[in-house]
Amino acid sequence: MSSGTLYDKVWDLHRVAELPGGSTQLFVGLHLIHEVTSPQAFAALRDKGLSVRCPERTVATVDHIVPTTSQSRPFADSLAEEMLSTLERNCADHGITLNGIGSGRQGIVHVIAPELGLTQPGMTVACGDSHTSTHGAFGAIAFGIGTSQVRDVLASQSLAMSKLKVRRIQVNGRLSDGVSAKDLILHVIRTLGVKGGVGFAYEFAGPAVEALSMEERMTLCNMAIEGGARCGYVNPDQVTFDYLSGRAGAPSGAAWDRAVSWWRGLASDPDAVVDDEVVFDAASIAPTVTWGITPGQGLGIDECIPQLEQLEPGERPIAEEAYRYMDLQPGTAIAGVPVDVCFIGSCTNGRLSDLRAAAAVARGRHVADGIKAFVVPGSEQVAKAAEAEGLDRVFQDAGFEWREPGCSMCLAMNPDRLEGRQISASSSNRNFKGRQGSASGRTLLMSPAMVAAAAVHGQVTDVRTLSLQSAV
C-alpha cells in the first residue's frame, strides 16, 4: 500500500483511469440511494437501455419524505407515496436491497449504513445527499453527489473526481464536560468559515478526536460539508473496529482478522505530508449555538451576537442579512433567546448516544409551557434500542413527542415543518432561510443536550448549568 495520508491511500486504491483534464475515474465501493435523488437517475438508465452495474454494492432506504407521526400506507401526501412507490419499483427491477418501512432496518441513510456495518474503512462511498461525508468517520472517503452522478454510479459503479487537498484539523486536549462533537464541529466551522474547506478533505485528528465514540465521530464528519470541505474523515482505530465487530455487514471469523489487519494500515502515516493544518484546543470550546443563517454564524453559549464592527469586512453583508431575518440584535446574549419548537434528530444527531444525552437532560423535568418538542430516532434500530432502555418514556414523561424514524424537521420535505416566524432549537445541520419548512422560520443549531435544555426552559440554555441524570 502506498504511503501518505488515508485520503491518498484510499484514492490510489480506487483509481480506475486518469481522465483528460486531470480528473480521475474512481471505483465506488458503496452506493447509497434514497427516494429523492434516485428517480431521475433510474429514468435515465431506462432511457438509455442500461442496467445497474453492481446492485450488490447499492443499498436503498426511504428517509426524506416519510411522515414521523404515522407511517401507514398509503401516505396522506400523494407525492410522498409516489416517490416511495417509485423507489420500491426501481429497487425491485434492478435487484437492489431496499431497507423499507417496517423492515427493522429503515432509517436515515447515513444512520443505517453504519449501524448495519456496511460502511467500512478504506471504502469509497457515494450518495445523492450532501451529508455523505458522515461515513468518513470510519476511515472511508465519502462524497455527496448530484442526480446525474447518481446515474453514472448506477451505470458504471464509478465516478469522475478531481483529487482534493488535505487539511488536518488537529484537536488537542479533551472536550470539557457538557461539550459535544456537535459543539466541536460548529466551532471549527465558525473559525474556518463555511467556505474555508473548499477544495479540501478534512482529516480530523488529535487526542480530542481519538477520544470520541464512533457516533460522535459521525457527527463531526457529517458537518464537514458545512465548512466547505468535500469530505471529512477520521483515521480508523480500535474504536472503529469495536463498533463494527459483529454487525451484519461486517466481516466475521478469519475474514474479520484479515480486514482489521488491512484497515490498520490505512491510517495516515506519521510522516504523511498534508497541505494545511489547523490546531484547536478542545478545552477552550464551549457549548455552541448558531445565531444566524449559516452554520458558520456560531457562538459559545456565554457570548453575545457580534456587533458589525467586530466582524471581518467580508462577513458583514451576511451578518446584516442575518440580523434582519433572525430578528436578533447585535449585542444580544445567545443564552436566553426564546424558542418555539425543539427538534432532536437528523443524520447529524439522531443516534442512540444523542438520544441518551438529551434524555439525561429531560429526565425529571418537563417541557416549558407553549413549547413543541419532539424526538425523531434516526432509524428503526435506534428507536428499538432507545425504547428498550426506556428513553421513549423519559421523553414522553417530560412532554416530548416520540416519533417514527425519518429526516423529519431537518428539511422541509415531509409534514414536520415550522410555521410562520417560529424559531427552533434544532440538532440538525443547516440553518438556512426556510430550511425547516416556513419561508420565514428561524433555526438555531445546537447539540441534542442543548436542545433538551432549551425545551425545558423555553429558551437557549447552557446545559452545563443543569444537573444531569442517567436516562437509562
From Swiss-Prot:
GO molecular function terms listed in the Swiss-Prot or TrEMBL record? 3-isopropylmalate dehydratase activity; 4 iron, 4 sulfur cluster binding; metal ion binding
Q: Pathway listed for it? A: Amino-acid biosynthesis; L-leucine biosynthesis; L-leucine from 3-methyl-2-oxobutanoate: step 2/4
**Coiled-coil intervals in this record?**
none
Q: Which GO terms describe its biological process?
A: L-leucine biosynthetic process
According to its UniProt record, which cofactors does this protein need?
A: [4Fe-4S] cluster
Alphabetic keyword roster:
4Fe-4S, Amino-acid biosynthesis, Branched-chain amino acid biosynthesis, Iron, Iron-sulfur, Leucine biosynthesis, Lyase, Metal-binding
Which Pfam family is one of this chain's hits?
Aconitase
* Residues reported to bind [4Fe-4S] cluster: 347, 407, 410
According to its UniProt record, the EC number is 4.2.1.33
What is the cofactor note? Binds 1 [4Fe-4S] cluster per subunit.
Q: Does the keyword Metal-binding apply?
A: yes
Q: Mind telling me which CDD domains this protein's record contains?
A: IPMI (cd01583)
The chain's disulfide connectivity reads: none
> Which PROSITE patterns is this protein grouped with?
ACONITASE_1, ACONITASE_2
As its record notes, the protein acts as a catalyst of: (2R,3S)-3-isopropylmalate = (2S)-2-isopropylmalate
**Which enzyme type, at the first EC level?**
lyase
PANTHER family named among the record's database cross-references: 3-ISOPROPYLMALATE DEHYDRATASE, HOMOACONITASE, MITOCHONDRIAL-RELATED
Family of this protein:
Belongs to the aconitase/IPM isomerase family. LeuC type 1 subfamily.
User: What does the record note on quaternary structure?
Assistant: Heterodimer of LeuC and LeuD.
Function noted in UniProt: Catalyzes the isomerization between 2-isopropylmalate and 3-isopropylmalate, via the formation of 2-isopropylmaleate.
Any idea what this protein is called? 3-isopropylmalate dehydratase large subunit
List the source organism: Parasynechococcus marenigrum (strain WH8102)
State the taxonomy lineage: Bacteria, Bacillati, Cyanobacteriota, Cyanophyceae, Synechococcales
